[in-house]
Swiss-Prot record:
GO terms for molecular function: ATP binding; ATP hydrolysis activity; ATP-dependent protein folding chaperone; protein dimerization activity; unfolded protein binding; zinc ion binding. This is ATP-dependent Clp protease ATP-binding subunit ClpX. Component of the ClpX-ClpP complex. Forms a hexameric ring that, in the presence of ATP, binds to fourteen ClpP subunits assembled into a disk-like structure with a central cavity, resembling the structure of eukaryotic proteasomes. The gene is clpX. PANTHER family: ATP-DEPENDENT CLP PROTEASE ATP-BINDING SUBUNIT CLPX-LIKE, MITOCHONDRIAL, ATP-DEPENDENT CLP PROTEASE ATP-BINDING SUBUNIT CLPX-LIKE, MITOCHONDRIAL-RELATED. Keywords: ATP-binding, Chaperone, Metal-binding, Nucleotide-binding, Zinc. One of its GO terms (cellular component) is HslUV protease complex. Gene3D superfamilies: 1.10.8.60, ClpX chaperone, C4-type zinc finger domain (6.20.220.10), P-loop containing nucleotide triphosphate hydrolases (3.40.50.300). One of its GO terms (biological process) is cell division. Belongs to the ClpX chaperone family. It comes from the Bacteria. ATP binds at P119, T120, G121, S122, G123, K124, T125, L126. Residues 3-56 form the ClpX-type ZB domain. ATP-dependent specificity component of the Clp protease. It directs the protease to specific substrates. Can perform chaperone functions in the absence of ClpP. It comes from Granulibacter bethesdensis (strain ATCC BAA-1260 / CGDNIH1).
């Protein structure tokens, strides 16, 4: 039985869990001699979701198997089967190494950091975020383009470790088992193959600065962030067991790989295969360390990232799946927003195809889907809170292409007023 709000103070009902009255909440659900409000229901659902998430990744020795990791990744990330397989094995081996590190001291297993290579919007960041969430370890992201060598204007490399420490609530032990994702590493490539008298503080200099923390060192982290001050007490964080995942689009890398495959060089005399013959993702899968070296990464930096996972371009079918299939799919997110207004939202197949094709045309991959949906739904989301008796909003192909207004279904009262 659903109890709605009443103005009669003598018969006021209260939530049996939080004690709020029916006037302070949206809904009260009645049970045998007890009531529970909508806020407590949401809280209970959050607790259950967290417990289910933790249960999914448990295995015999406490380290999730690659298949378990991949299975959970499938719930959130569409496609990229090869990249998910590579990541699952690498992450499993990393945390198995930590779990059994003290048992076998005769052989020391090295750390395998990961390089993610793929076009913009193919899911590099989402894969790293999802891995950290399902493993319940601290996670932080850094943009390589904002980093500079120590002593120059910009962000210190140590600030990455500070962010990880903050994500771990300043628990040093937890932070030392966390995951760091460094995005846009292709933007810190060496500006030229030839040595220069001018110092490259935001390119090769950043690669040099990252070497130590990626390999394993004790970083002195100022608790307040920013540049170091002599008066500050530093926190000591050992980065040996922190997993570093570096990602980048590496635009133009496929041409370097293609020229190697054809035996040619780079320049006017190079014979490069037409990029339309094969998709970029297929070419990137053939990447070798020498290709990354020619792109502008220094040998030491490449050596710190032994595991390389390449991601494919997303086609129309994959983008439509991304819109609808994952647990936190965009269509479901906007559907929930409309539910808060008491309205259901639906997209026709041709509308989804239109959205996917616009993202492909923009070359933004999955990252561009939200902005496209925002543009389509902006007018509706602006008007809807002030409208009455709207039951359903339907987005079809014409609406998605901006040639028509969204289709709205009204409740009985509105129909009665129209007929009158």
């Amino acid at each position: 039985m659903l109890m709605t709000k009443s103005g009669d103070s003598k018969n006021t009902l209260y939530c049996s869990f939080c004690g709020k009255s029916q006037h302070e909440v949206r809904k009260l659900i009645a049970g045998p001699t007890v009531f529970i409000c909508d806020e407590c229901v949401e809280l209970c659902m959050d607790i259950i979701r967290e417990e289910n998430k933790t249960h999914l990744v448990k295995s015999r020795d406490g380290v999730p198997t690659p298949k378990e990791i991949c299975k959970v990744l499938d719930d959130y990330v569409i496609g990229q089967a090869h990249a998910k397989k590579v990541l699952s094995v690498a992450v499993h081996n990393h945390y198995k190494r930590l779990a059994h590190g003290q048992k076998n001291n005769d052989i020391e297993i090295g750390k395998s950091n990961i390089m993610l290579i793929g076009p913009t919007g193919s899911g590099k960041t989402l894969l790293a975020q999802t891995l950290a969430r399902i493993l319940d370890v601290p996670f932080t992201m850094a943009d390589a383009t904002t980093l500079t060598e120590a002593g120059y204007v910009g962000e210190d490399v140590e600030n990455i470790i500070l962010k990880l420490l903050q994500a771990a609530d300043y628990n040093v032990e937890r932070a030392q088992r966390g995951i760091v994702y460094i995005d846009e590493v292709d933007k810190i490539s060496r500006k030229s193959d030839n040595p220069s008298i001018t110092r490259d503080v935001s390119g090769e200099g950043v690669q040099q600065a990252l070497l130590k923390i990626m390999e394993g060192t004790v970083a002195s982290v100022p608790p307040q962030g920013g540049r170091k001050h002599p008066q500050q007490e530093f926190l000591q964080v050992d980065t040996t067991n922190i997993l570093f995942i570096c990602g980048g689009a590496f635009a133009g890398l496929e041409k370097i790989i293609g020229s190697r495959g054809k035996g040619g060089g780079i320049g006017y005399g190079a014979e490069v295969r037409d990029p339309d013959e094969r998709r970029t993702g297929e070419i990137l899968r053939e990447v070798e360390p020498e290709d990354l070296l020619r792109f502008g990464l220094i040998p030491e930096f490449i050596g710190r990232l032994p595991v390389v996972a390449t991601l494919e371009d997303l086609d129309e079918a994959a983008l439509i799946e991304i819109l609808t299939k994952p647990k936190n799919a965009l269509v479901k997110q906007y559907g929930r927003l409309f539910e808060m207004e008491g309205v259901s939202l639906s997209f026709t197949d041709d509308a989804l195809k239109s959205v996917a094709n616009r993202a492909i045309a923009r070359k933004t991959g999955a990252r561009g889907l939200r902005s496209i949906l925002e543009g389509i739904l902006l007018g509706t989301m602006y008007d809807l809170p002030g409208m009455e008796n709207v039951e359903e909003v339907v987005i079809n192909g014409e609406v998605a292409e901006g040639r028509a207004a969204p289709l709205m279904t009204y409740g009985p009262e509105e129909r009665a007023e129209e007929s009158a």
